[in-house]
Amino acid sequence: MRIIPAIDIIEGKCVRLSKGDYATKKIYNEDPLEVAKSFEAHGIEYLHLVDLDGAKSSHIVNHKILETIANKTSLKIDFGGGLKTDKDLQIAFESGASQITGGSIAVKNSDVFQNWIQKFGNKKIILGADAKDRKIAVSGWLEDSNEEIIPFIQNYEEKGVKYVICTDISKDGMLEGPSFELYKEILSETKNINLIASGGISEFDELPKLAELGCEGVIIGKAIYENRISLKQFENYILNQ
């Protein structure tokens, strides 16, 4: 199972939110590159980079930070937040993203999202399925949709989606443990999805449980920044896989 630390960006700084609420913003580091380099120094190969300014304004904003991290580390970066147009994707990929995550766009403009899958391939386009009470939330989680999470993912699997990041918003940033039951259900109701668990990771012992369920990756944010899990623990986990 891949270990994927998260860096969320607001105004160029590394922050975390609780349950996606921008009012709960806490700045952890002024320099996202420094954070990314510390991940790489501990054997981590992947990074989930979220442009929260972009998510709010519905277009790419913090691509210069993406470019800096891509140029100065070897991390494979999945970039998301406010990606709405082919131009946004072009900027993201040219700035060094290995993959992009589309969330709101997959709900609000499925034709565009499907076109991205055709154009760039399903290894580069990740479906962001962010759920609040089992309904998909959009626009930086500021709006709810009527899309139920399981049919939503099943529908996109039929359309060729391979990678899905699923965040249970009620868990995100709360350090109360992930949504094991939800992930178990998604994996039992889909055929070949590479499911990346996100939200609520609070301690190291949760990782083997997610791997056992069949999650292909796990995104960890606040547990790192609040020192609940050390980078050394990740390093050992990666070495022993």
Swiss-Prot record:
GO terms for molecular function: 1-(5-phosphoribosyl)-5-[(5-phosphoribosylamino)methylideneamino]imidazole-4-carboxamide isomerase activity. Pathway: Amino-acid biosynthesis; L-histidine biosynthesis; L-histidine from 5-phospho-alpha-D-ribose 1-diphosphate: step 4/9. The active site is at D8 (proton acceptor), D130 (proton donor). Keywords: Amino-acid biosynthesis, Cytoplasm, Histidine biosynthesis, Isomerase. It is found in: Cytoplasm. It comes from the Bacteria. The keyword Lipid metabolism does not apply. InterPro entries: Aldolase_TIM, His_biosynth, HisA_bact_arch, Isoase_HisA-like, Isoase_HisA-like_bact, RibuloseP-bd_barrel. The keyword Cytoplasm applies. GO terms for cellular component: cytoplasm. Its EC number is 5.3.1.16. It holds the Pfam family His_biosynth. It catalyses: 1-(5-phospho-beta-D-ribosyl)-5-[(5-phospho-beta-D-ribosylamino)methylideneamino]imidazole-4-carboxamide = 5-[(5-phospho-1-deoxy-D-ribulos-1-ylimino)methylamino]-1-(5-phospho-beta-D-ribosyl)imidazole-4-carboxamide. One of its GO terms (biological process) is L-histidine biosynthetic process. CDD domains: HisA. Disulfide bonds: none annotated. Transmembrane segments: none annotated. Belongs to the HisA/HisF family. PANTHER family: 1-(5-PHOSPHORIBOSYL)-5-[(5-PHOSPHORIBOSYLAMINO)METHYLIDENEAMINO] IMIDAZOLE-4-CARBOXAMIDE ISOMERASE. This is 1-(5-phosphoribosyl)-5-[(5-phosphoribosylamino)methylideneamino] imidazole-4-carboxamide isomerase. It comes from Christiangramia forsetii (strain DSM 17595 / CGMCC 1.15422 / KT0803). The gene is hisA.
